[in-house]
């Protein structure tokens, strides 16, 4: 009998300490006031990732509150079109289109929320990285995202077209710092427990050990 073993992606969870100096330098470089909330998009700027949906979300949320900075970090085929579209948004002064930032740790650390509006996904590293920093994720319920995020426990899942729902949830979370912190702590705990590189290594070695044991017994 053939057996398939699934092993989760793992990330380094040892670099989750807040870089206070780095945060302030980053905010200064990109003109982000300390009294602003921050929601980020991190990933490729390509059609299947739906970065245009992030713009739609930003415009809707801006109608409700103007204290949010929207960060987009990444490169891709839609860069020029997105830059042009942002220039015509009411919230254009609140946008920061940064290009690729590597490592993106500092972006997660300054952000209150990460939004993943994709039409299709596997198990994206940006979600694991964001959660490891205690930054809650709002995401389309597609691909492997439901394998990482438990809705309303350590993140939030939505139908991919439900921008209104994402907007309402983001507004609620930004108004409830205690609940936002609770979700963030749950996120960080889940990554440490289930998605660390150490756990991935242990599980991989266990599979190899089992295979070697079976082969030695013929």
Where is each model-derived feature located?
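Donor nucleotide-sugar binding/catalytic pocket of nucleotide-sugar-dependent glycosyltransferases
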Residues: 1-21
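A short, well-ordered alpha-helix in the C-terminal region of glycosyltransferases
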Residues: 28, 165, 172, 179-194, ...
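A conserved mid-protein helix/loop that constitutes part of the nucleotide-sugar donor-binding site
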Residues: 37, 41-60, 77-83, 125, ...
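A short helix/loop element that forms part of the nucleotide-sugar donor recognition site in Leloir-type
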Residues: 17-32
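Short hydrophobic beta-strand element within catalytic cores of glycosyltransferases
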Residues: 136-139, 149
